[in-house]
Structure formats: C-alpha cells, structure tokens
Amino acid sequence: MARTKQTARKSTGAKAPRKQLASKAARKSAPATGGIKKPHRFRPGTVALREIRKYQKSTDLLIRKLPFQRLVRDIAHEFKAELRFQSSAVLALQEAAEAYLVGLFEDTNLCAIHARRVTIMTKDMQLARRIRGERF
C-alpha cells in the first residue's frame, strides 16, 4: 500500500478562538485550500541549463529519423523523380545535417554573446553565416 501524506486538521475542541495579532492575521489572510499543493517549479534557467548538459553529453541523433527521411526524399524528388536511398545514406545525411546545425548554433550563440545578449536572434544567425562565407 502506498504511503500518503497526512495533513493537519482543525480540531473541534471546546476552547473558544482567541483574537489573532495583526501580523498573524495578515499572514493567514489567504484561505487554506484544503491541502492542495502548488506544483514544484524550478527557477528560470535551471531547466535550460540541465537540458544543455544533457544534450552535450549525448551522441544520439536529435531529429526524428522518419520526418528527416521524408524531407530528404521530398527535396530529392525535385531533382529526379525515381531516386532510391540506402538507409545508411539517409543516416549519413542526417549526421552531417545535425553536425552542421550544431556548429551553426554555436557560432550564432557567439554572435549573440558578442552583442552582449544571451538570446539568439535571426540577425545572429545571418551574421554567423556571412562570416562563414555562406550565401543566404
């Protein structure tokens, strides 16, 4: 049987309620909600830092395989109608695409930091691509 948390209940004793001090009355102005507890929330940025550490540790692919495969086939269909792909070829394309995106986001983050910001913007990505010598 699972343990349950016991909450304190008001007694129905014979003593009459005493007058509360002003400071105590101000503290207890919000009515008790019958033991309903607010869900725990981390401070802003804590979860983001945890996710950064998690994804920097991992080596697995971050983009789902089937949507990426559909995208590759859709782009290839514009050039030639009857193209077939080995699964290893799609996997190699996905590895290369994710490596490119990670590098681009690293450079974009450096551009945002250079502008004394922590939030990346479109102009940071455009600057990173321009410095790399890519056309956009």
From Swiss-Prot:
Give the primary localization class: nucleus
Instruction: Spell out the molecular function terms from Gene Ontology.
Output: DNA binding; protein heterodimerization activity; structural constituent of chromatin
What lineage is this protein's organism placed in?
A: Eukaryota, Sar, Alveolata, Ciliophora, Intramacronucleata
Report the PTM annotation: Phosphorylated to form H3S10ph. H3S10ph promotes subsequent H3K14ac formation by GCN5. H3S10ph is only found in the mitotically dividing MIC, but not in the amitotically dividing MAC. H3S10ph is correlated with chromosome condensation during mitotic or meiotic micronuclear divisions. Acetylation of histone H3 leads to transcriptional activation. H3K14ac formation by GCN5 is promoted by H3S10ph. H3K9acK14ac is the preferred acetylated form of newly synthesized H3. Acetylation occurs almost exclusively in the MAC.
Subunit field text: The nucleosome is a histone octamer containing two molecules each of H2A, H2B, H3 and H4 assembled in one H3-H4 heterotetramer and two H2A-H2B heterodimers. The octamer wraps approximately 147 bp of DNA. Interacts with GCN5, whereby H3S10ph increases histone-protein interactions. Interacts with PDD1 and PDD3.
* List of residues that carry Phosphoserine: 11
**Localization annotation:** Nucleus; Chromosome
Q: Which residues carry this modification: N6,N6,N6-trimethyllysine?
A: 5, 10, 28, 37
Which of the residues bear the PTM N6-acetyllysine?
Answer: 5, 10, 15, 19, 24, 28, 37, 57
Q: Which Gene Ontology cellular component annotation is one that this UniProt entry carries? A: nucleosome
Q: Gene3D superfamilies per the record?
A: Histone, subunit A
Protein role: Core component of nucleosome. Nucleosomes wrap and compact DNA into chromatin, limiting DNA accessibility to the cellular machineries which require DNA as a template. Histones thereby play a central role in transcription regulation, DNA repair, DNA replication and chromosomal stability. DNA accessibility is regulated via a complex set of post-translational modifications of histones, also called histone code, and nucleosome remodeling.
Homology family: Belongs to the histone H3 family.
What induces or represses its expression, per the UniProt entry? Highly expressed in growing cells, but only at low levels in starved cells.
Kindly give the Pfam families that the UniProt entry links to this protein: Histone (PF00125)
- What CDD domains does the entry give? HFD_H3
Can you say what this protein is called? Histone H3
Residues recorded with modification N6-methyllysine: 5, 28, 37, 57, 80
The record gives the effect of mutating residue 10 to Q as:
Reduces greatly IES elimination
